Amino acid sequence: MSNSESDGAAARAKESRRFFEKQLAGEQPLSFETAGQLFRLGMQLLAVQPWEFLEDQDLFLMQDGESGEICYCSTMGALGEVFSLQVYTGAESYRFFRRIAAGKPTSAGDFYSSMRGVSVEFVTAREQTPPDRELLEAFGHLKKRGKRAPIFRALRPGYHPWYVTEGEAKILVYCLQGILAFCRHAAEMGDIDYWEKEDVFPFLVPKAEDKTHEHFEIRLVKAPEPPVAAPRAEELDESLISGILPEYLPKRGALEADHFFTGAKIGEQNERKACLRIAMVSDGDSGVAFQPELGKPEDSTGQLLARALLGAMRDGRFVPSEVRVRHKEFKILLSGLSEKIGFGVRVTKSLPALDHLKDHFLAMVGDPGEISDW
């Protein structure tokens, strides 16, 4: 084989290489070409260090060309602790970002249950996993004590950050191109405050004649907090209800019910780690805990609450006169069940019996607590 043939074979072998294949079984792994783009753009952003002149809450917006969704992009690093570009996609993620930026109490479970997007974080070798190091070494990164390098992650509601698929990586490539163009523009224009007006942000639009995505037009757009989507009552699982109705159980007392995600991880070594999700019910008078209902990230909140309540009624041998919940959303989700069985649902700020159980459970599973405590 000639040298040119050998070089060509080596190049083809590289091009066919994939990253994160074991960790993304059943999904499209990261291609060599896209991984190379991520690495080069990530290293460029690390050199620019945008956190030196951008605050964590200085969002810029872009539109995903495939889905049409808005990407809300934020650089982190002004505090000198975490250095990253975070890209939040969709209205729910944006709404939750604003909640964090406003300093409202936010648990780890709340964060992971709501956020969807992609990120590049710049970490030292101690924080890099073997799959991360495999990618970095493939593009010539030399490991050095204390030296930071980019790692690439995706956030999906109900899951911990995990390795990016090919599709998720392309969104991140696009947003990296956008912030690098924005940084070049900011360096040329000097001290311009794009965020001086409330709810107004720079929106980056690729110039039509530029196929490289290196040049963007900057438009200022108003992006107020989107309204919360109205919940709808869940369809009833008649097979579960039939186990309650014919028994003519006595009606008495109150039950306290809640649903939440925790920061505890569930999953095998090379699996995307789900957050432990649970619906809990306790007797509002005695504080007795009933069997909790565990759920997957994709499960319906209303169904989890309904199953937990029906299980409590079966085990407790009574139908409550009242069910107390913390959120108006839960009252709506349970409206069909409450009408069918005949109990009231009341929204209250405090669930003393259940909160005691919840705090004990979170401590037992090692939940990290509120984001401000991390």
Task: List each model region and its residues.
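Secondary-structure boundary/capping micro-motif
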Residues: 2-279, 284-374
